[in-house]
Every structure is written in structure tokens, then in C-alpha cells.
Amino acid sequence: MQTARLFQGNLNLAAANIRDYEKKEQRNLGVWLSLNQWLRLYDEDTRFWWTTTAPMLGRMMELIGYDQDAQQKHLLFYYIYVLPSLGRRPSPEGYPTGWNSFMTDDYSPLELSWDWGVAEGESSVRFSIEPIGKYAGTQADPLNQKMVYQLVDGLRPAFHHTLDLTLFDVFSEALTTSREKFGTRKLSLEGRSQYFVAFDLDVGHPRLKAYFMPGLKSIESNTPVSELVVKAMDACELHFGSLFMQAFRRLNSDLEAFSATSYHRPEIEIVGIDCVSPVKSRAKIYIRHRGTSFDSVCRMLSMGAKAPLDAASVASLRELWALVLGLPKDFPSDQELPSVPHRTSGVLYYFEIKPTSDAIVPKVYIPVRHYASNDLSIAQGLATYFERRGQTVAAENYVDALSDIFSHRSLDSGLGLHTYISCTFKKTGLSVTSYFNPEIYHPNRYRQ
């Protein structure tokens, strides 16, 4: 296996001549440039992904205070395990080759994020990918099934016996399908993704999370997604325990009642888990709702709740909602945002449940990708929010940092760099995360 060979030999790799960057792009890439002198890229696909995406990841870590040892460790992890899983490089004209990933709206198979926490000093870097095989989308691998298993199995040496795939296997069986089961049904170029994986780059070792999209399984089995998810949770009852199941059934009951009376029916899109011992894992149910008023957001966040939402957190959320979407202060809470006819329009939520509690932790993903003015206005709005809460470093550096990391275009030239600004309701307040599409296929990256 390629990843295993890389793991065994990474410290002895010979130096390679990587495409030179302009001096202005080199000035802040110290750890990446240092590694770049010694790492050998196995083919042009991994060369593209390393030179295009790894500098972004390195700068994101550097700008929020990761020391050089941590940066090096995580970049080596990215090089060894992740690069071979990003699929083929784009065509010379800058188009996907063989597989359109649902990870981002432009099909980039990678999403980067800064988790800012609730207060100063709580920030960390995360990223998510769709593992894509070399032959994904072809007759040899039409559903892109192979690479996710190669990646997950190959990660074992890096996780020092903490990797547990019990839940991965259960949810994979319950929520995804195979080429053999799907048969000759016609597939569109879009909507084929079934697996994402994500990594939290903590101080210690990265943490692995897996995500399952049941859309194809629903078609193959002629079963609504909601029923598939209920069956998957029931199959895990022995692993998750009674408290978890109480919370899930409460959430599911509330969703069904809301769907019966709502003009917009909430739709389950993704189920996520942590790849650790089931008793330490979480299940996260991702739901998209087409309602976009702030009142609708509050109603959705209350799904399955045993108590009302914290008033102070709701007030903070409304402030952030207005700042990043560029709404006036007097924008009515019951007014919908302008209609956007897109597959990912509306508002995305997740509901987190743990085996050790019957509590449900809600999270909202503010859909700035579709409803804000441009990426500069989003960045300025988020910086203002940070400033008002004493997160001085983030407030002062956020806009310039984005311009530095994503230098292929100006922030005020359009939307798409920010995918979401998310908020999790925690006991100490709102925990904010900003998510980014690296815009792998942006035309500016391919102009001579």
C-alpha cells in the first residue's frame, strides 16, 4: 500500500525539485519549504496537491500559533496519508478529472477550517476531504468505493492503537451502497459522494472523523434517508446505550412533527462519527432546511431540546448572523433571505449526541456561501464579531490572513472561499468555526 510505504520511508526520502513559487509566495512558508527540500513526490497528482494545498494548511497553523514541531508533524501526516487520497489533479484547463466531489460547491475535494472556540487561545486547524481513487468515476470504480478503505486502513500506524473502526463498519453497511448492489441504475456526475473523512489537528495526534451520505443507498434500497438513519442508529444501540437512544428518538420525533407542519421539510444529508471506541464517540446528524429566516434557525436549533436555548447565545448568534451576512440591524427575524436556487442553499445544522448523555448539542452553519455579498464582507463581519468578544488576535489578523493564504484572487471579487461560518451552542457561549473552499478549480489558478 502506498501510504504504508510512505510512512516507513518518509525520513529517508531524497530531495526533489518542486515547482518554484514566486518570492512573494515563499515569504511565509517556512516549515512547508523546509519539508519541500527533502520530500519526494511519487507522481504529478501528488505533486499538484502538495504544492497547491499544503502551503495553505501550513500557513493556517502558523497564523494561529502552532509551533514548528507541530506544523512539521501535521504536514508530514498530510503528505504521507492524505495526498494519495485526493485523486487526480485537475485538467490543464482547470476542471475536475473523473469525479465531482460534493465536499464543496465547485467540486474541490478538500475543505479547510479554523475552529476559533469561545475565547482567545482556543483556536485549532481542521480539514475534511473526500477520499478519491485514481479510477473514481470510471468503470473500474464508478462509485469511488476503494480509496476510503485504503485510507482508513492505512491510518492505523499513525493513530497508535486509538483508531477504532467499529462504528465506521456499521454505518458504512447501513448508509452506503456498492457497485454490485447499485447495479445498472443511471448515475449523474453529481450526487455520487458517499464518504468524507475529517482530521482535527490537535496538539497530540490528529483525530479522525468519518461521514456518510445515504443518498445513493436510499435510491438503491428504495428507502427514505430518514428511515435508513433510524435503522443505522438502532443497529448501534448496544454500542451507544440507552441515554444516547433516548436523545436520538427525541430528536427524530421532533423532526417528524416539525416536518408534518412545515412548508420546508428538513432533510438529513450526512451522518458523522468519531473513529474511536464507540463509548467515546459522537454521532452527528446533519440536516438541511430550506427556511432561512432567523426565527426558522432558532426553531431548528431547538429540535429535541429538553430546555429553551440560552438567551445570551441566541443574541450572540443573531449578531453574528447579521454581521457575516451583511444584514441591517433591523432586518426582521421572520423574513427569509433572498431565494437561491442551488443544491446547497438553505441552512445546514447538525445535532450531536454522545453515549454518556441524553443531551443534544446543536450547531448551525451560517450559509455565507450563498447569501453574503462577497468574501471580504464576510471576513470583516467575522473580525468585528471577534473584536467585540475580546478575541483580539483573530480580529486584527483575520482579513489579512485570508488574503495571504488564498492569494489566487481578491476577497472582494466574489463568493465561494468561505463556505460556512458555524456556531455550536456550548455552556460557556458560542463556539465559532470558519470553513474554506480552497477553490482548486478557480480560473485564476490556471492562467498563464
From Swiss-Prot:
InterPro entries: Aro_prenylTrfase, Aro_prenylTrfase_DMATS, DMATS-type_fun. Its EC number is 2.5.1.122. Coiled coil: none annotated. It holds the Pfam family Trp_DMAT. One of its GO terms (biological process) is alkaloid metabolic process. It catalyses: L-tyrosine + dimethylallyl diphosphate = 4-O-dimethylallyl-L-tyrosine + diphosphate. Induction: Expression is co-regulated with the other genes from the sirodesmin cluster and corresponds with sirodesmin production. The keyword Transcription does not apply. It is an enzyme of class 2 (transferase). GO terms for molecular function: transferase activity, transferring alkyl or aryl (other than methyl) groups. Pathway: Mycotoxin biosynthesis. Keywords: Transferase, Virulence. Belongs to the tryptophan dimethylallyltransferase family. Homodimer. 4-O-dimethylallyl-L-tyrosine synthase; part of the gene cluster that mediates the biosynthesis of sirodesmin PL, an epipolythiodioxopiperazine (ETP) characterized by a disulfide bridged cyclic dipeptide and that acts as a phytotoxin which is involved in the blackleg didease of canola. SirD catalyzes the O-prenylation of L-tyrosine (L-Tyr) in the presence of dimethylallyl diphosphate (DMAPP) to yield 4-O-dimethylallyl-L-Tyr, and therefore represents probably the first pathway-specific enzyme in the biosynthesis of sirodesmin PL. This is 4-O-dimethylallyl-L-tyrosine synthase. It comes from Leptosphaeria maculans (Blackleg fungus). The lineage of its organism: Eukaryota, Fungi, Dikarya, Ascomycota, Pezizomycotina. The gene is sirD.
